[in-house]
Each structure stands twice: as structure tokens, then as C-alpha cells.
């Protein structure tokens, strides 16, 4: 028989030691009632439940199950894994890319950078369309997406995310139509007198898409953190939205570096470098604050491989982006901006931008798959719960869990 730390709270034993059980069974005597009116078949302390309640008045040890190492509930997982696949991973990546590209496009409009403006707006609408299609593919039928727009539930990240995506798509669609009309020489779209109206909506539409850009990049992290999946829930409490926003900035800056002229992508390079620094710091801080059992799925197996690839690509892309920035500011001026210099900088910009975008994609897929893996082993659920319980006990909180006594 074992004891618990709660034995320190029980009153001292009476003088003379422990009372011995009388003969005649587990009751107070052999008859129907023992001394003091206690009935046979009940424990010597007069409480119901027989031998299980011996010592329930606090005067001696109570039978307890000894501490055991938890393995599983009959070999079954405690938390059911969400039925999410590559479609959701694609949406996570493209949603962040769309949001970051929209911000870059708006900035390019304000600073008169037509090449980066066109590239960023085209990227934003393409990412929105493909990401939305991936989301619908995961839902199974398009009407399920429309059904989520029947209500607005502020407490639901999924409900808010539906409206964020829709609002962002409207603004991005208008700016895309304007850019398409410009590229085709105002000949493709039969707008007639409505052309001036369309072009007059450019700034309001750009502001709208920029307004929804950051929420679009961040809400998916809040959505994952609101689930019961161990790794996602812990990551959501410890900074996953910062990881996703930084990753989106890195991806958007990288794609702009790959598609737009080097002379115009200075803001994109700075955004990409800020995103790499932000993701590296936020990811490291998030891991340190999580329980080791919650971090394990992010280090092992295929999710761990993807997150390690993301780290390597992030470093390589950041070094390349910094080299392009230095080259564009220093060497191009000293060397006169010859075609060889421009070709080297252009090639390095494309490769570095692609590496940064790939790093962002690996981060999203790695986090997604790590959460799914964490549901397969009950240890990822039980050990963090026990650690949190012990922490509360150490602070004197013993009345907020069914596993603690009064």
C-alpha cells in the first residue's frame, strides 16, 4: 500500500495506535449491529463502502493505486487525429503567401515600383485562388464553404477565417483585374465606360486586401492552436501565430525577389530578411516553452525532416538575400551596373527567393504533420498534462482537477 503527499494534511492518529478490526467479519461485530450502532458489512469507521473506505476520516492511510508509467488506453489514441492532408498544408502556405504579397503590392503602388507591384498582385490572387481550391477540395463540396458564411462566430477561428479569406479575395480580385487590364492594353476586358470606375477602385481595393493580409496569414495558427491536438495546442499557446506571420513575410519577400526586377525589390528583400529572423526566433522560443513530449513530433520522423529542411533553406535564402541587397547597393554602383553584374544579382535573387519560399512551405507542412503525429502516441497527451498538474500542485492549487483530492 502506498501513500500520497496528501497524508501530511490528515489529523494525527489517536493515542494507543491504530484500532484493530474486530472478529466476526468486516463489520463492527459478528451481529447485525456492532458497538456504537455500526452495522455489519460496513467499515469500522461507520462509512459506507466497506474496506475501501477504511481511513476515509483521515486517521490512517487509504488504499491507493501506485504510480505507473502510462502507455495507452488499450492501444488506442486519446485524441482523434484530424482528417487533414496535403490540401490543408497547401492552404496554410498559400494563405500566408497571399497575405504577404498583398502588403508588398500595396507598398509597391505607393512607392512607384510597377514591376514588383504587378508580380506581388499576381502572386496574391494566384495564391488565393489555388489555396481556396485546396480548401474546398478538403471540404469535399463547394457548398460547405458557402455554408460557413451563413453566420459570423467571433469565438470561432474557422468562422472568422472564412470571412477573412472572402474579404481578402474581393480586394485582391479587383487589383488583379486592374493589372490584367493594364497589361493587355485595356483591350481584353470589355468594360467600356466602367473602365474608369474599375481603375478608380484600385487604391480602396488595395487597402482592403492589405487590411485582411495579416489576419489571413495568422488566423490558421490560431485555428490549429484551438484544437485538442497536443503539439498544435501547445504551439498555439506559445507563439505559433508569430511563426506563421514571419513565415508569410519570408515567403512573400522571396517570391517577389524571384519574379520582380532586382532594382525594385529592395523592400521585398528587407521583408524577407525580417521574416527569416522572426521565424528563427519565434520557432526557437516556442520550442523552449513547450513540453518536451509536445516538441518530440517536431523533431522526429517526416515532420522533423521537413522542419530541419526549412531551417537549412531559411539560412541559405537569408544569406543569398543579404548578398543581393549588398550587391544591389554597393557593387552595382561601383561596377557601373554592367550586364554581368546584373545577371549575377538576378540569378542569386531568384535562387534565394525560391529557397525562402520553400522554407516557408516546409515550415507549414512540418507543423501540420507534427500535430497529426502527436495524436498517435498517448504519451504526448498524458505527460504534458501531468507536468501542468504538478506545477499547479507546487503553487498550492489542488482543487481544479479530478485527479487531486480535498
Predicted stretch roles:
Residues 1-406:
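Short amphipathic, positively biased membrane-proximal segments
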Amino acid at each position: 500500500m502506498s501513500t500520497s503527499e496528501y497524508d501530511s494534511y490528515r489529523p494525527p492518529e489517536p493515542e494507543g495506535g491504530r484500532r484493530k478490526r474486530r472478529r466476526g467479519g468486516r463489520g463492527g461485530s459478528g451481529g447485525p449491529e456492532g458497538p456504537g450502532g455500526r452495522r455489519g458489512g460496513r467499515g469500522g469507521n461507520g462509512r459506507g463502502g466497506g474496506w475501501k473506505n477504511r481511513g476515509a476520516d483521515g486517521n490512517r492511510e487509504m488504499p491507493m493505486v501506485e504510480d505507473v508509467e502510462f502507455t495507452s488506453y488499450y492501444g488506442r489514441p486519446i485524441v482523434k487525429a484530424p482528417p487533414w492532408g496535403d490540401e490543408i498544408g497547401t492552404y496554410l502556405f498559400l494563405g500566408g503567401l497571399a497575405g504577404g504579397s498583398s502588403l508588398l503590392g500595396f507598398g509597391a503602388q505607393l512607392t512607384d515600383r510597377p514591376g514588383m507591384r504587378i508580380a506581388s498582385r499576381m502572386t496574391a490572387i494566384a495564391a488565393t485562388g489555388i489555396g481556396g481550391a485546396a480548401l474546398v477540395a478538403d471540404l469535399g463540396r463547394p457548398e460547405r464553404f458557402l455554408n460557413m458564411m451563413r453566420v459570423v462566430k467571433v469565438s470561432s477561428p474557422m468562422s472568422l477565417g472564412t470571412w477573412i479569406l472572402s474579404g481578402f479575395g474581393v480586394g485582391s480580385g479587383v487589383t488583379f483585374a486592374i493589372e490584367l487590364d493594364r497589361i493587355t492594353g485595356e483591350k481584353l476586358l470589355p468594360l467600356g465606360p466602367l473602365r474608369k470606375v474599375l481603375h478608380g477602385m484600385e487604391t480602396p481595393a488595395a487597402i482592403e486586401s492589405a487590411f485582411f493580409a495579416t489576419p489571413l496569414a495568422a488566423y490558421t495558427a490560431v485555428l490549429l492552436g484551438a484544437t485538442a491536438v497536443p503539439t498544435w495546442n501547445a504551439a498555439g499557446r506559445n507563439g505559433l501565430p508569430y511563426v506563421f506571420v514571419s513565415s508569410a513575410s519570408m515567403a512573400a519577400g522571396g517570391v517577389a525577389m524571384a519574379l520582380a526586377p532586382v532594382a525594385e525589390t529592395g523592400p521585398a528583400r528587407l521583408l524577407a530578411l525580417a521574416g527569416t529572423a522572426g521565424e528563427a526566433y519565434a520557432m526557437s522560443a516556442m520550442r523552449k516553452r513547450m513540453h518536451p513530449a509536445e516538441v518530440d513530433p517536431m523533431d522526429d520522423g517526416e515532420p522533423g525532416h521537413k522542419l530541419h529542411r526549412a531551417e537549412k533553406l531559411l539560412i541559405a535564402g537569408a544569406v543569398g538575400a543579404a548578398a543581393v541587397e549588398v550587391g544591389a547597393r554597393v557593387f552595382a554602383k561601383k561596377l557601373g551596373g554592367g550586364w554581368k553584374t546584373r545577371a549575377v544579382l538576378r540569378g542569386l535573387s531568384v535562387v534565394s527567393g525560391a529557397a525562402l519560399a520553400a522554407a516557408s512551405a516546409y515550415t507549414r507542412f512540418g507543423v501540420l504533420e507534427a500535430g497529426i503525429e502527436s495524436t498517435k502516441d498517448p504519451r504526448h497527451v498524458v505527460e504534458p498534462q501531468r507536468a501542468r498538474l504538478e506545477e499547479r500542485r507546487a503553487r498550492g492549487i489542488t482543487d481544479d482537477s479530478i485527479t487531486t483530492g480535498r
